[in-house]
């Protein structure tokens, strides 16, 4: 029994270290307004889809359903639009630098983004519509208060596997017109 408890304790302590191996899309925090971060994101490669079974289609792509039959590491975050009809995976930096293979699956596309400024607000736990709405409202109110103009629609970002139970990271984000004087 003592060995079982020790083994379980070791596994639980190690889980955050294992989770840290996931590559996170790089960004630089430029400024903070309360709980809202203004960030600079360099160019990145996304693989996007829409129209149902979005996660499955993107997972098939990184599992080898692409022109090179190349397996690609899962990264974070996963991007979703407000009604969850569109989803995108960020490609690892190495794939971005060499170029992502073309998808074989229908309704899956590779997109290279331009560098951009965004405003983001982070929250924990499992996400749901109530949390998303509250954080979207807080994000947009903070931007308005600080005279920062949002560009386009908000995006919802998930960083964790559904099997991660604690220290979960979610964000609501929107591209902004950024002026360093504000």
Where are these regions (language model features)?
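A solvent-exposed interaction/effector surface
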Residues: 2-5, 15-182
């Amino acid at each position: 029994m003592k060995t079982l408890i020790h083994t379980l304790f070791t596994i639980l302590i190690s889980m955050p270290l294992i989770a840290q191996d996931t590559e996170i899309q790089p960004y630089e925090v430029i400024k903070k307004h309360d709980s809202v971060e203004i960030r600079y994101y360099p160019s990145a490669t996304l693989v996007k889809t829409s129209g149902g079974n979005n996660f499955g289609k993107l997972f098939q792509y990184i599992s080898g359903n692409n022109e090179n039959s190349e397996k690609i590491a899962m990264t974070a975050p996963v991007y979703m639009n407000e009604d969850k009809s569109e989803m995108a995976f960020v490609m690892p930096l190495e794939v971005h630098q060499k170029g992502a293979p073309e998808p074989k699956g229908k309704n899956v596309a590779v997109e290279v983004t331009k560098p951009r400024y965004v405003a983001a607000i982070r929250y924990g736990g499992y996400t749901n519509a109530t949390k998303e709405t509250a954080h979207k409202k807080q994000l947009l109110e903070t931007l308005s208060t600080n005279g920062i103009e949002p560009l386009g629609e908000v995006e919802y970002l998930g960083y964790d596997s559904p099997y991660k139970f604690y220290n979960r990271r979610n964000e609501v984000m929107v591209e902004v017109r950024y002026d360093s004087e504000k």
